[in-house]
Amino acid sequence: MEHYISLLVKSIFIENMALSFFLGMCTFLAVSKKVKTSFGLGVAVVVVLTIAVPVNNLVYTYLLKENALVAGVDLTFLSFITFIGVIAALVQILEMILDRFFPPLYNALGIFLPLITVNCAIFGGVSFMVQRDYNFAESVVYGFGSGIGWMLAIVALAGIREKMKYSDVPPGLRGLGITFITVGLMALGFMSFSGVQL
């Protein structure tokens, strides 16, 4: 149990997808103007990562890995396209659920909801799972923790950006300029966790 708690804390803080690996930056910067919208997208990313990483773990382990289906056959060259297909299917299902049950959130996310399909954080989570050879339980914990970490980062950035509306930002830095500086400072803050040994 201690191993899984360690993996969860590590994936949220020490190896944060947004602030340590800078994955998923396009939606991270574009949707982080309001806390409510950022929280909605963060929840969507948590759901997709929590499901996509373990599902792709099963696909990789039982279909693509060497000797998985047939002895002597290695289908790992199909990994990327298979992972993207699974992620795309999960995002489509999530999009239909949000459209049906949460129309305001669906409309607020707009084009960024389908873009979760090609969000680097989602694909990065799946790729790290394969690279680190996580088992199914570890991949569930890692997917959930990575999603929570990404959501934490985007909601924190949105809160800071909402407060900065009332700040006296120099004209040359207004908009994305000050946002990049803010993200850099947040990343420095998260770097302080890098020395933590779990």
From Swiss-Prot:
Molecular function per GO = oxidoreductase activity, acting on NAD(P)H, quinone or similar compound as acceptor
Per the record, the GO terms for biological process are: respiratory electron transport chain; sodium ion transport
Membrane protein topology class: Multi-pass membrane protein
Predominant subcellular localization, coarse grouping: membrane
**Top EC class of this enzyme:** translocase
Catalytic activity line of the entry:
a ubiquinone + n Na(+)(in) + NADH + H(+) = a ubiquinol + n Na(+)(out) + NAD(+)
- Give the enzyme's EC designation: 7.2.1.1
User: What's a single GO CC term here?
Assistant: plasma membrane
Q: Which UniProt keywords apply?
A: Cell inner membrane, Cell membrane, Ion transport, Membrane, NAD, Sodium, Sodium transport, Translocase, Transmembrane, Transmembrane helix, Transport, Ubiquinone
* Compartment list: Cell inner membrane
Residue stretches spanning the membrane: 11-31, 39-59, 77-97, 110-130, 140-160, 176-196
| InterPro entries in alphabetical order | NqrDE/RnfAE (IPR003667), NqrDE/RnfAE_oxidrdctase (IPR050133), NqrE (IPR010967)
**Pfam families this protein is in?**
Rnf-Nqr
- Key word Transmembrane present: yes
Function according to Swiss-Prot or TrEMBL: NQR complex catalyzes the reduction of ubiquinone-1 to ubiquinol by two successive reactions, coupled with the transport of Na(+) ions from the cytoplasm to the periplasm. NqrA to NqrE are probably involved in the second step, the conversion of ubisemiquinone to ubiquinol.
Self-association and partners: Composed of six subunits; NqrA, NqrB, NqrC, NqrD, NqrE and NqrF.
Record-stated family: Belongs to the NqrDE/RnfAE family.
Q: Under what name is this protein listed?
A: Na(+)-translocating NADH-quinone reductase subunit E
Organism of derivation: Aliivibrio fischeri (strain ATCC 700601 / ES114)
